[in-house]
């Protein structure tokens, strides 16, 4: 069957923790099914494969994550938000 987003779930509210170093706060996007390496977009922008594998460095805001198959068909979509204040780099 078509790949589906396993994490984060739709409607998830995540929190940025200012006591943890920024570079250690990463979100791993997970997919189930599909059999091939999917393509991801976050708020309409493609995510490079290395970002997906290493984890996306979280930042506050609202986000829409989409999953596409190898033919470019969207197979799933989820929305999530991140609360908190990001410290300066």
Segments predicted by a language model, with ranges:
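Soluble, non-transmembrane domains of envelope/secretory-pathway proteins that act on or interact
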Residues: 1-89
């Amino acid at each position: 069957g078509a790949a589906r987003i396993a994490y984060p779930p739709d409607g998830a509210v995540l929190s940025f923790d200012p006591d943890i170093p920024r570079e250690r706060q990463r979100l791993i996007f997970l997919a189930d099914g599909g059999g091939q390496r999917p393509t991801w977009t976050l708020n309409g922008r493609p995510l490079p494969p290395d970002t997906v594998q290493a984890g996306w460095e979280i930042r506050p805001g609202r986000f829409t994550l989409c999953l596409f198959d190898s033919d470019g068909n969207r197979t799933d979509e989820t929305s999530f938000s991140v609360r908190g204040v990001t410290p300066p780099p």
